[in-house]
Amino acid sequence: MNVLFAVSEAFPFAKTGGLADVAYSLPKALRKLGVDIRVIMPKYGDIPSDYTTKMKHLCHFTVPVGWRNQYCGIEYLNFEGVPFYFIDNEYYFKRPGYYGYYDDGERFSYFSRAVCEAIYHLDFDVDIIHVNDWHTSVIPVLLKAHYSHSPKHQKIKTVLTIHNLRYQGVFPKEVMYDLLSLPDEYFDENKLKFYDAISFLKGGIIFADKVVTVSKTYANEIRTLSHGEGLHGLLSGIGEKLVGIVNGIDYEVCNPATDKLIFVNYDANTFESRKKENKFRLQQMLNLPVSDDIVLIGMVSRLTKEKGIDLIERILSRLLTLPVQLVILGAGDYHYEQMFKYYAIAYPSKVSANICYSEELARKIYAGSDIYLMPSLTEPCGISQLIAMRYGTVPIVRETGGLKDTVKPYNQFTGEGWGFSFANYDPAELFAIIKYALSIYSDKAQWRSIVHQAMTRDNSWNASAGEYNRVYEQLLK
């Protein structure tokens, strides 16, 4: 089974968010199952020279972009056992950053068409193209419109994974005519038309053979008016074509037993004393009073309403009257950045506000915190709660998307569960569940049980890769 994984970013070459982590970890896990999966992505100008100098030029050809033919080179690099192809075009991709340009519609029209054209030139007989988010969602449309008579393309099946429905690749309808060379019939409610524009993501949902979202709960949520981002009607109508497969994390990268970025290594059998040492060292590093009686609450997050920061804002004064310390790492909306800076100055023994991003500090927070706070308004899957559990930090989450699927609330009567959760987007519920978690923390035996259950959960890519493999196999039957 040969799969071409088309994506706009992949760790370690280019990363803005969780999509890059998926593009790194999922193909690696699928190759262990015997799937010959290869990643294809743009060769951005910001890719570190450590990698570009090792790339091998395979071939070059031209790609039709409207009435023009644009150069396309294919570079190759095998990284940690996964083959990567890079689409090389300096006009479109040799720029600072990856997204946010006025011509993103043209850039990713070109990239999508280049992926289709590359099928002619790669020494790789593709069975499935797996596309991701709006950047590559138009590939299934192009296969139908321009390549249905090509023997190399006719048999290809397509899978679309929606990592976040909010970003839909909406562009003026002229993009459809002038850049994608699609006829009038594609400007239709049942194809690309989205109000008076076109949506790449909508086209992918309609034309892909299978649509996957990154958790089962999110797959159900996006069929509703409140979470459907204007596409709920379409998503409700595609039935079993839409499935949810929860993301995993790379257990080789996220491993408290070997992580060189944390203070002291530990595992599920040694966490009790060694995790405490990480807590004390983190408190010391951040100039917080060193104490195990104080519950250390950590957050590594974008500071936006989507992440539930407005709920925290409404309870923060009351929260700081409790025996807790709050450590924040992240950046985002100016208002929330200033709010946390204010509380860090007003309560220097209770709040540490780190308005930036540091992978090293993030790992130290995962390892040193007692509780990880994630009260998101929406969360398609979420990776942070999985990392927190891997490091024995107990998550408090809102029951939405992948948070609901991955965190089982603790039941003190049965002793089962590895986190705490609340249902409604309400500050009173958040405050109540934090107080409940603090009451459980005071019972060390119960808390040890919760931490052990969290650390021994299998949130690696193994199970998820198996589900993707079954999706592929069903398409090729």
UniProtKB/Swiss-Prot annotation:
Keyword Transferase part of the UniProt annotation: yes
Binding site for ADP-alpha-D-glucose: K15
CDD domains, per database record: GT5_Glycogen_synthase_DULL1-like (cd03791)
Catalytic activity: [(1->4)-alpha-D-glucosyl](n) + ADP-alpha-D-glucose = [(1->4)-alpha-D-glucosyl](n+1) + ADP + H(+)
Record SUPFAM superfamilies: UDP-Glycosyltransferase/glycogen phosphorylase (SSF53756)
Pathway the protein acts in: Glycan biosynthesis; glycogen biosynthesis
EC number: 2.4.1.21
Superkingdom as given in the UniProt entry: Bacteria
Pfam family of the protein (one): Glyco_transf_5
One GO BP: glycogen biosynthetic process
Keyword Lipid metabolism in annotation: no
Any one Gene Ontology molecular-function term assigned to this protein's record: alpha-1,4-glucan glucosyltransferase (ADP-glucose donor) activity
Leader sequence segment: none
Keyword list, A-Z: Glycogen biosynthesis, Glycosyltransferase, Transferase
Physiological role: Synthesizes alpha-1,4-glucan chains using ADP-glucose.
PANTHER family assigned: ALPHA AMYLASE DOMAIN-CONTAINING PROTEIN, GRANULE-BOUND STARCH SYNTHASE 1, CHLOROPLASTIC/AMYLOPLASTIC
Family affiliation: Belongs to the glycosyltransferase 1 family. Bacterial/plant glycogen synthase subfamily.
Designated name of the protein: Glycogen synthase
Gene name linked to the record: glgA
